Amino acid sequence: MRERFCDILRSTGRENIDYVIEDLEADGFFEAPASAQGHGSYPGGLTEHSLNVYDAAMSMREALLKLRPDLESALSPDSIAIAALLHDVCKADFYTLARRKKKNEIGVYENVDVYEIHDERFPIGHGEKSAMLVLRSGLDISEEELLAIRWHMGPWNLSRDDEKFYRQASRISPLPPLIHAADTMASAILERPAAKI
């Protein structure tokens, strides 16, 4: 998975992409979970989730271009790769492993490993943090890609101003709503355990 992730990023030919990959490695991105208890809550889950978002976004792009061929340049494969693969970089170095008591299937408490969130190191919003970390790595990134990373969570739990900004970002480029939809599809459908379907 790590190799495929890095190969896709490098295929964009972006200046400083190797610095981004170095920073991801240093922050533990490739070993990190995607969430504390939900989708991808295991080592490497974040890499798997990011690739699922990329695959979902590329599939949606293909379907959208059949309906709207004029969107081809606005939904370039390189922009989708950058936004989809880097939308959750803020989750690297965000979770720590802890031991908790939890009831098993027969009601007996046992020690289990769980992830806990530790965001006190850089407490800033989820989408904003990912966008800042990508910029901090020196990546040559477009405004549309930044908007897609910033708004990948969609219009949930936003202030009135933030709802307005989300709508504005969606009018500027189709990339933010595409990445939001792909992220939702990956976490809520593709990564759902088969037993829960």
Language-model features, listed with the residues they occupy:
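Short coil/turn segments at secondary-structure boundaries
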Residues: I17-L24, A32-A36, T96-A98, D161-E163
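A general structural signal marking secondary-structure boundaries and capping sites
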Residues: T12, R61-L64
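Amphipathic, well-packed alpha-helical segments that form the structural scaffold of globular domains
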Residues: E25, L51-M58, E62
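Generic alpha-helical structural signal
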Residues: E3, D18, L51-D55, E128
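Inter-helical turn/loop segments and adjacent helix faces that build the functional surface
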Residues: A63-L71
